């Protein structure tokens, strides 16, 4: 007997119910529950759209004032010294890491050569 098209998809066409062998899929992948929508007018109050776009105008003179304030030469020198010190520290740490990597790779190479020599001695 040929199966009905609805039964091929896992639905009993006479009852419109999920067939038992497809029930496990419903348990594994439950459908997400959507939150109930609030009726219009009872949601949170929104600010008027115009208030979001209001900003204080900035003039060219104000921008120049900020640039002119600047940092004292002593603070600038201190910051530069700190920056160069951190660069040097970073360089040393990367250099030591590369040396460790080279030592590790040479050690692995030496061990692999030693093991091949011992095999040939047998």
UniProtKB/Swiss-Prot annotation:
<feature type="modified residue" description="Phosphoserine">
    <location>
        <position position="96"/>
    </location>
</feature>
<keyword id="KW-0963">Cytoplasm</keyword>
<feature type="modified residue" description="Phosphoserine">
    <location>
        <position position="86"/>
    </location>
</feature>
<feature type="modified residue" description="Phosphoserine">
    <location>
        <position position="72"/>
    </location>
</feature>
<dbReference type="InterPro" id="IPR031521">
    <property type="entry name" value="DUF4695"/>
</dbReference>
<feature type="modified residue" description="Phosphoserine">
    <location>
        <position position="118"/>
    </location>
</feature>
<feature type="modified residue" description="Phosphothreonine">
    <location>
        <position position="55"/>
    </location>
</feature>
<protein>
    <recommendedName>
        <fullName>Uncharacterized protein C11orf96</fullName>
    </recommendedName>
</protein>
<keyword id="KW-0597">Phosphoprotein</keyword>
<dbReference type="Pfam" id="PF15766">
    <property type="entry name" value="DUF4695"/>
</dbReference>
<feature type="modified residue" description="Phosphoserine">
    <location>
        <position position="112"/>
    </location>
</feature>
């Amino acid at each position: 007997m040929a199966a009905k098209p609805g039964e091929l998809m896992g639905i009993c066409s006479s009852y419109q119910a999920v067939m038992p062998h497809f029930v496990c899929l419903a348990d594994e992948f439950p459908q997400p529950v959507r939150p109930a929508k609030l009726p219009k007018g009872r949601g949170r109050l929104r600010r008027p759209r115009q208030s979001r776009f209001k900003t204080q105008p900035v003039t060219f003179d104000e921008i120049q004032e900020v640039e002119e304030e600047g940092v004292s030469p002593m603070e600038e020198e201190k910051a530069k010294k700190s920056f160069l010190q951190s660069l040097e520290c970073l360089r040393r740490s990367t250099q030591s890491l590369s040396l460790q990597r080279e030592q590790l790779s040479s050690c692995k190479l030496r061990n692999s050569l030693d093991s091949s020599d011992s095999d040939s001695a047998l």
